[in-house]
Regions:
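Non-catalytic, solvent-exposed segments at the cell envelope interface
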Residues: 2-29, 37-350
Length: 350
């Protein structure tokens, strides 16, 4: 071998070492970047979770009672005129099996706090069901005047369960009556929806002529039957509409429609919009979901929306699955629970 060839060998070895050294540096830099991103993500999640409120259970000492104060059941404005009087003992509830399926059920609770009350009734109860297999998000409103069995208490209105025993009793009530396993609860004040709607830039809703007439009496903007743009203030008025355009049934339907409109608006939301939502809205939300559950369910829900998944709406009870009655001075809806459970199974699970 020539002398000049011998002289080249160390130089080639040095190049290999330099190449290996360069790869190692690149790997270290990549690891540092990944670590920095993970730390940033963790700090961001801690910031997000720190904004949320948390439920406290149990309430009122957790005592089991068989009688409720009269004022706890009846409303001063109760109107039972024309309703059939039914003895409470004539309404019989049976034990039911829990509905099963790969579905996440989250109960969205809207509050109705009255003066002097420590805990409000659940004014609105909307079940958000994430079905990954079907790629759908289903919203089910439960009428607050449903007459149901509440474990440890007299049978009474569904919306009393949260006031008497918080989310624990509320979830148990849904389980024994409707066979629903609730995975978590999120409580919001529908008044706070104005902030959400302002951040997403308003919503577009299809409304009826009766709804348009109601809105025109209460808004500076003009509404017509069909598609209309709603700013935050008008959307709040729309969700509160009760004594017109369908009464309480119409009100729960309007709440679902506004939630759907917000969800569709979030499909294409940018990072600035999402950050504003986190910063301004989360402080008004209370939940018993763990941090891990929030990440999992939010990822599932956003994934369904991003893939063009459908959002369906439903109401319990359906028109043919209940009758109106006067029980102990309360105007209530007595449900056919078997029909209700069949409807829920078909809408959410099948």
């Amino acid at each position: 071998m020539a002398q000049d060839e011998f002289e080249k060998l160390p130089e080639e070895g040095q190049k290999k070492k330099k190449k290996k050294s360069g790869c190692l540096i690149a790997l270290i830099v990549a690891l540092v970047i990944v670590l920095a991103l993970l730390i940033t993500a963790a700090l961001g999640l801690n910031y997000v979770f720190g904004k949320l409120g948390r439920f406290e259970n149990p309430v009122q000492g957790g005592e089991t009672i068989s009688m409720l104060p009269e004022e706890a059941e009846t409303d001063p404005a109760e109107n039972v005129e024309g309703l059939e009087s039914v003895d409470a003992s004539d309404v019989v509830f049976e034990t039911v099996d829990v509905l099963e399926g790969d579905v996440v059920n989250i109960m969205l609770i809207g509050q109705d706090r009255r003066p002097g009350e420590e805990r409000a009734r659940s004014d609105s109860m909307i079940l958000v069901s994430l079905n990954k297999e079907r790629g759908t998000i289903q919203l089910t409103s439960f009428m607050r005047d449903l007459y149901v069995q509440i474990p440890g208490y007299l049978d009474t209105r569904l919306n009393a369960a949260y006031r008497y025993g918080g989310t624990d009793l509320m979830n148990e009530t849904f389980k024994v009556n409707f066979g629903l396993e609730i995975d978590g609860n999120v409580m919001v004040d529908f008044d706070e929806f104005t902030e959400i709607i302002e951040i997403v830039g308003g919503v577009t809703l299809d409304i009826s002529s009766a709804e348009a007439s109601y809105m025109n009496k209460r808004s500076d903007n003009h509404f017509k039957a069909g598609s209309n743009y709603f700013n935050a203030e008008d959307a709040l008025t729309f969700t509160r509409m009760r004594y017109a355009a369908g009464g309480d049934y119409g009100r729960t339907d309007r709440q679902r429609r506004v939630i759907m409109a917000i969800a569709y608006s979030l499909r294409n939301a940018d990072l600035v919009t999402i950050f504003n939502l986190i910063d301004q809205v989360l402080p008004h939300i209370v939940t018993n979901l763990t941090d891990a559950q929030i990440i999992e369910y939010a990822t599932t829900g956003l994934g369904i929306l991003a893939n063009g998944g459908e959002i369906g709406t439903f109401r319990i009870p359906q028109d043919d699955a209940h009758y109106n009655a006067n029980i102990r001075g309360m105007a209530v809806l007595v449900p056919d629970l078997e029909m209700c459970r069949e409807d829920l199974k078909e809408f959410i699970y099948d």
